[in-house]
């Protein structure tokens, strides 16, 4: 009715979170992709693309193969509709499952670039965009990580989007809404980096 586009998020079996192995997601989604396209994608002009919902942060067992297989199946069945992923950056605020506020073994900008260069190299032909979640790094790290993200996306002909998290990871209560000043800092950093 309003000319908006809908991106369908693939099924998350939860097995990856328990095993660290993304190959399960490929098997479970083979049927989901076919069914969704048959019942919705082929019938509605608002169906704009696919969200490959396996969220990773680093070089993960089976991730390149899984993202490639899922992206290819989505594109093949839908005549090339766009696909995107939304990983997180393994920064010091990536502390799920712990009572700590930060962690010591956060990824460096250089290691992040190395790992995501390898991942993008293996998926860029079937994944059109990457929207890194921005909540796991500190505000003074935004420019460094965002500029690397944009550089890599440009290198591989992908779009670089932001996933501006609207909840606050700086609080011991998970998760309060973020103050607008903090959200604005993240959006302005994405703009400075030239995100699409």
Regions found by a protein language model. Give the residues of each.
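Glycan-processing catalytic domains of CAZymes
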Residues: 1-196
């Amino acid at each position: 009715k309003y000319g908006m586009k809908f991106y369908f998020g693939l099924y998350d079996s939860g097995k990856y979170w328990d095993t660290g192995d993304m190959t399960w997601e490929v098997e479970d989604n083979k049927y989901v992709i076919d069914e969704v396209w048959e019942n919705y994608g082929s019938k509605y002009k608002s169906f704009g693309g696919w969200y490959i919902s396996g969220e990773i942060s680093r070089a993960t067992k089976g991730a390149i193969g899984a993202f490639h297989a899922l992206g290819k199946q989505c594109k093949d069945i839908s005549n090339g509709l766009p696909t995107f992923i939304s990983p997180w950056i393994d920064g010091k605020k990536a502390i799920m499952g712990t009572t700590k506020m930060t962690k010591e073994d956060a990824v460096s900008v250089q290691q992040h670039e190395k790992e995501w260069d390898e991942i993008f190299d293996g998926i860029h032909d079937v994944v059109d965009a990457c929207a890194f979640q921005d909540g796991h790094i500190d505000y003074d790290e935004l420019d460094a990580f965002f500029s690397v993200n944009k550089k890599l996306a440009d290198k591989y002909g992908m779009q670089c989007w932001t996933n501006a998290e609207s909840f606050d990871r700086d609080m011991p209560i998970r998760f309060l809404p973020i103050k607008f000043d903090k959200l604005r800092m993240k959006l302005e950093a994405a703009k400075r980096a030239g995100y699409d």
